[in-house]
């Protein structure tokens, strides 16, 4: 009799788990083609995914200024689980009952980040005033509409009270693991939205810096010009023989110049240009200022 009752209890628990799994799968399917704004408009989705609805509505404050304008988007999808078949054949021990049973399914949630490749505005009041676009023919490129960079993806494992990184295509030099440890663990599962927000801004800042570097490179046509940068485009070096030697350091979370060291060649000597350095620091128009300065006739008259 005890064995029959034990079996009945085990069957009931398995049924409850299977029902819970089906509910989670249905919820993930409903997220297909959704956007982050949809989560705000559908509190039942955020609640079932253990995301606090009030936190979703809250606009993050006290964040560093992001000196760029971009059109970007975050969308959700349900990816296929490559481990689904292996899980069906995997047996595990139930910690509560001690029974051996099939490994439970852990749902996946996919997030796609789409970032504009070209800036709508990167320090210029309008495109017609942009000396970079005029010098590089970028106005013609923008006439046909803007383009997107390759999309970036993050696949999450969805647990009862938290999320976990499973796979992602974010470049390794953009470290998101620290944010994942802070915002996705069981202690702070309601902060899923802020994690996505921070990753989106990190990617947008990186693409903006990369594009700014490309624009500067296209604009400077002086013979002997050498422009280099690290992978994250936060450390930029510009060298023009007998004209300028400049080292610029940008914030990893924006396009702001946070440190600079610039030497100008004058009277057969290299002299540090403190005025130009100060004009670039924390100035969203620093690309404009730098290119205008370097393309001015007096800047390379010594050549």
Swiss-Prot record:
Pfam family, one: CENP-O
GO biological process, alphabetically ordered: cell division; CENP-A containing chromatin assembly; mitotic sister chromatid segregation
Cell division listed as a keyword: yes
CDD domains noted in UniProt: DRWD-C_Mcm21
A GO cellular component annotation in the UniProt record: kinetochore
Key words of the record: Cell cycle, Cell division, Centromere, Chromosome, Kinetochore, Mitosis, Nucleus
Subcellular location per the Swiss-Prot or TrEMBL entry: Nucleus; Chromosome, Centromere, Kinetochore; Chromosome, Centromere
Entry keyword annotation includes Chloroplast: no
Subunit structure: Component of the heterotetrameric kinetochore subcomplex COMA, which consists of fta2, fta7, mal2 and mis17. The COMA subcomplex is part of a larger constitutive centromere-associated network (CCAN) (also known as central kinetochore Sim4 complex in fission yeast), which is composed of at least cnl2, cnp3, cnp20, fta1, fta2, fta3, fta4, fta6, fta7, mal2, mhf1, mhf2, mis6, mis15, mis17, sim4 and wip1.
Family from the record: Belongs to the CENP-O/MCM21 family.
Function according to Swiss-Prot or TrEMBL: Component of the kinetochore, a multiprotein complex that assembles on centromeric DNA and attaches chromosomes to spindle microtubules, mediating chromosome segregation and sister chromatid segregation during meiosis and mitosis. Component of the inner kinetochore COMA complex, which connects centromere-associated proteins and the outer kinetochore. COMA interacts with other inner kinetochore proteins to form the inner kinetochore constitutive centromere-associated network (CCAN), which serves as a structural platform for outer kinetochore assembly.
Protein name listed in UniProt: Inner kinetochore subunit mal2
Species in which this protein is naturally found: Schizosaccharomyces pombe (strain 972 / ATCC 24843) (Fission yeast)
Gene this protein is translated from: mal2
């Amino acid at each position: 009799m005890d064995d029959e009752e034990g079996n009945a209890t085990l069957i009931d628990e398995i049924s409850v788990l299977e029902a819970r799994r089906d509910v989670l799968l249905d919820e993930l399917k409903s997220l297909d083609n959704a956007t982050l704004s949809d989560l705000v408009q559908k509190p039942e989705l955020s609640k079932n995914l253990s995301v606090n609805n009030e936190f979703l509505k809250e606009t993050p404050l006290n964040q560093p200024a992001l000196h760029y304008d971009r059109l970007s988007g975050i969308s959700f999808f349900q990816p296929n689980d490559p481990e689904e078949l292996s899980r069906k054949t995997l047996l595990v021990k139930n910690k509560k009952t001690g029974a051996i049973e099939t490994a439970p399914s852990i749902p996946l949630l996919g997030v796609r980040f789409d970032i504009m490749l070209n800036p709508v505005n990167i320090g210029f009041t309008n495109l017609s005033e942009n000396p970079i676009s005029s010098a590089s023919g970028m106005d013609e490129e923008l006439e046909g509409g803007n383009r997107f960079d390759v999309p970036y993806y993050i696949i999450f494992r969805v647990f009862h009270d938290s999320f976990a990184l499973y796979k992602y295509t974010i470049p390794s030099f953009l470290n998101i693991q620290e944010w994942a440890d802070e915002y996705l663990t069981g202690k702070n599962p309601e902060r899923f939205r802020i994690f996505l927000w921070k990753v989106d801004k990190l990617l947008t800042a990186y693409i903006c810096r990369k594009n700014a570097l490309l624009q500067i490179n296209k604009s400077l046509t002086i013979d002997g010009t050498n422009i280099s940068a690290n992978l994250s485009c936060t450390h930029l070096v510009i060298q023009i023989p007998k004209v300028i030697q400049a080292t610029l350091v940008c914030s990893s979370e924006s396009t702001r110049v946070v440190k600079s060291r610039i030497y100008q060649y004058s009277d057969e000597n290299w002299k540090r240009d403190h005025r130009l350095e100060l004009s670039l620091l924390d100035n969203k128009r620093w690309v404009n200022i730098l290119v205008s300065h370097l393309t001015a006739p007096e800047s390379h008259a010594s050549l």
